[in-house]
A protein has these predicted regions:
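Short acidic/glycine-rich loops and adjacent helix/strand connectors
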Residues: 2-189
């Protein structure tokens, strides 16, 4: 599957800033951000590519969560009954701000100017994932991140994939296909 098909499948607005060129096959620089359920840190990496193939990697960075934020996230994950329907907007804003700070730190350390970045994809912090029930809850506010970064943001990948009958991990196969496409078969990913 190509990135353009992924955007369409997930009903992601392909060009939220109106530049008109995010879906072309010219080289684009994308930053991806994820944090695992261990909440040990925020992983940031950058790839440049055409939407079909990766043409250059720009390294990565892991920024640990602050101890109090990590402790609060882990406590919440241990009590799933507190997650469904709960108002977690304050915690979500703190998580979002931490993720934005990680992106800004990464761009600075990698020497990446924000004007070069086409899009930043944020997974958010998963606090409850029950794909059999079609339910997943990530803490992340994409609109807040876009305002803080002033870069187009895509987020909430799991919800659309779950709604389409998936397991809530729509980017992993596309990412692996893009990275492995230049390799000679057979391949094990």
């Amino acid at each position: 599957m190509q990135f353009t098909e992924l955007f369409k499948m997930n009903k992601i607005q392909p060009d939220p800033c109106g530049s008109g060129d995010i879906m072309t096959h010219a080289d684009k620089l994308a930053i991806g951000v994820i944090s695992g359920t261990s909440a040990d840190g925020i992983d940031v990496a950058a790839l440049q590519g055409t939407g079909i193939a990766v043409t250059q990697t720009h390294g990565g960075l892991t920024l640990p969560y602050a101890g109090d934020l990590r402790a609060e996230l882990l406590a919440l994950m241990r009590t799933p009954e507190r997650v469904r329907g709960a108002d977690l907007s304050d915690l979500e804003a703190r998580v979002t701000t931490a993720h934005v700070a990680a992106v800004e730190g990464f761009m600075e350390s990698a020497g990446i100017d924000r004007d070069r970045v086409t899009v930043v994809g944020f997974h958010g912090q998963t606090i409850l994932h029950q794909p059999a029930d079609g339910y997943s809850r990530q803490l992340f506010d994409g609109a807040l991140a876009a305002r803080l970064l002033q870069i187009p943001v895509v987020a909430d990948f799991r919800a659309a994939d779950l709604a389409a009958g998936g397991e809530g991990a729509p980017l992993a196969p596309v990412y692996h296909q893009a990275l492995s496409s230049p390799l000679t078969p057979p391949q094990v990913i």
